From Swiss-Prot:
Listed name of the protein: Phosphomethylpyrimidine synthase
NCBIfam families assigned to the protein according to its UniProt record, in alphabetical order: PRK09284.1 (NF006763), PRK13352.1 (NF009895), thiC (TIGR00190)
Any single Gene Ontology cellular-component annotation: cytosol
Positions contributing to substrate binding: N239, M268, Y297, H333, S353, R354, G355, D394, G395, L396, R397, E433, Y460
Protein EC: 4.1.99.17
Reaction(s) catalysed (UniProt annotation): 5-amino-1-(5-phospho-beta-D-ribosyl)imidazole + S-adenosyl-L-methionine = 4-amino-2-methyl-5-(phosphooxymethyl)pyrimidine + CO + 5'-deoxyadenosine + formate + L-methionine + 3 H(+)
Organism: Escherichia coli O1:K1 / APEC
InterPro entries reported in the protein's UniProt record: ThiC, ThiC-associated_dom, ThiC/Bza_core_dom, ThiC/BzaA/B
Binding site for Zn(2+): H437, H501
Pathway linked to the protein: Cofactor biosynthesis; thiamine diphosphate biosynthesis
Species classification: Bacteria, Pseudomonadati, Pseudomonadota, Gammaproteobacteria, Enterobacterales
UniProt entry tagged with the keyword rRNA processing: no
Pfam families the UniProt entry points to: ThiC-associated, ThiC_Rad_SAM
Record keywords: 4Fe-4S, Iron, Iron-sulfur, Lyase, Metal-binding, S-adenosyl-L-methionine, Thiamine biosynthesis, Zinc
Family membership: Belongs to the ThiC family.
Amino acid sequence: MSATKLTRREQRAQAQHFIDTLEGSAFPNSKRIYITGTHPGVRVPMREIQLSPTLIGGSKEQPQYEENEAIPVYDTSGPYGDPQIAINVQQGLAKLRQPWIDARGDTEELTVRSSDYTKARLADDGLDELRFSGVLTPKRAKAGHRVTQLHYARKGIITPEMEFIAIRENMGRERIRSEVLRHQHPGMSFGARLPENITAEFVRDEVAAGRAIIPANINHPESEPMIIGRNFLVKVNANIGNSAVTSSIEEEVEKLVWSTRWGADTVMDLSTGRYIHETREWILRNSPVPIGTVPIYQALEKVNGIAEDLTWEVFRDTLLEQAEQGVDYFTIHAGVLLRYVPMTAKRLTGIVSRGGSIMAKWCLSHHQENFLYQRFREICEICAAYDVSLSLGDGLRPGSIQDANDEAQFAELHTLGELTKIAWEYDVQVMIEGPGHVPMQMIRRNMTEELEHCHEAPFYTLGPLTTDIAPGYDHFTSGIGAAMIGWFGCAMLCYVTPKEHLGLPNKEDVKQGLITYKIAAHAADLAKGHPGAQIRDNAMSKARFEFRWEDQFNLALDPFTARAYHDETLPQESGKVAHFCSMCGPKFCSMKISQEVRDYAAAQTIEVGMADMSENFRARGGEIYLRKEEA
């Protein structure tokens, strides 16, 4: 924890400096590699961790070494992870997917924005200083067309996005030759299909079946294709966003870049403060990962925070505004029905979802059914025209252990299953949001209920938190639940930071939340038996046993912290080659003792083998050469 708290002015200046000096950079001893596909422009980035050789013998003067293979890993940092790419936040990222979108010939550029709010913002000269300079000309589907990845998948079309994803999900493991590294324990997948090699056809089939989604708005061509589904790697989402009392555009862009560096597969912009529209434009134009939003937040700001004043017209305009900016998925709380609200009355913590409480208040104020539910087909029509995926929000999720798995929670879940089928009629991609606060013994039911009632659409959960007693450490309490539900089949985990329940996260909180959730997601991949998931673990264990300290740091999810902790007690360069660490010291290191035991056993085997050969030689008469029939 920082000793001195920065002022708001200092925080903003720090963020501005970060943006002004931003360069592509790799993690220590890593390099960016690209694997090309068959579609034009399919060039999939990965991070390759370079390892030092293993000492296998020889003398002090002439040591003998054995090379260790470089380890390729999934990389979400986009151009920010490539030192060869010049970064200019003012111009935004290269439009990777634009040629693929244009080649399909089913979109058209809009000469006039569809959103009245967008038109008003663009006409306001007072916003020129805040505005992203290179505003994208938005596209939408041509009349009579749908432009979603689900639509293409159902038609049997393998898009460049699907091939990109197949290469990415395989994580370059075909490059690994060592049997030691390729060894993997059998997993327990709870019904997930995990092929040894992920092909573009497998990706297409999973998307067509609704078991996976590719969030990829046609107006966010800067994003690198990724997939969310239980038959793929478990993904992690990071939340950023300003509020009425804190943060600026500069700080949110900084948090975006920071999030992708530390492994965020998607980012949700949950801004509720000033300049929401302008902040989102900066984020989208500089994001290599899909961006999600909760449109009801901005709609509420447009009616001055008064839930009762919300209307379908305001909400629809907000959907069009965000879809034409390039938002990849919307969280829509369409399952909070009027008849479900009384079910929450006996809860300890009531309705804790911000979106859920907004819609519950609207329903009660008007004594009408949720307009998001009533107008759901119109929402789907908008999404189909831009390929905005739907994340059906769990507005009635439990906010405490006591309220877990109650009547209101599962009633809403069943409604989300009904809405999923409606969205699929429009070829709109869907995932389902889940809890929340759930004790460990009750977590698996959430997954089985979702699979059954939501037709195997991908599940996306906030944690769940497994206990309520640890404010300040809820990244731990939720990381436990996240690892479990990821193992059971959850496709994406929404991170929780140490500030959960306490305040808006800063940069360091974002990192802590992401590292915790990358651990949870990876642990789930190991438990499921995802092919290749154990390679990095095996490489780390081998480096640890061989006292290759630099390799241990570099293979870590957070190399900087690993190195810092080691150097607190052994800061000298000699500590980086020592065959012990500060925990046990040189005489009591279990790994060193194990090596000595192994060397002794090997020597004994040789000695016994030589004795056996000597006895055999004497038994044969001591002749150097034997006749062929005697040999």
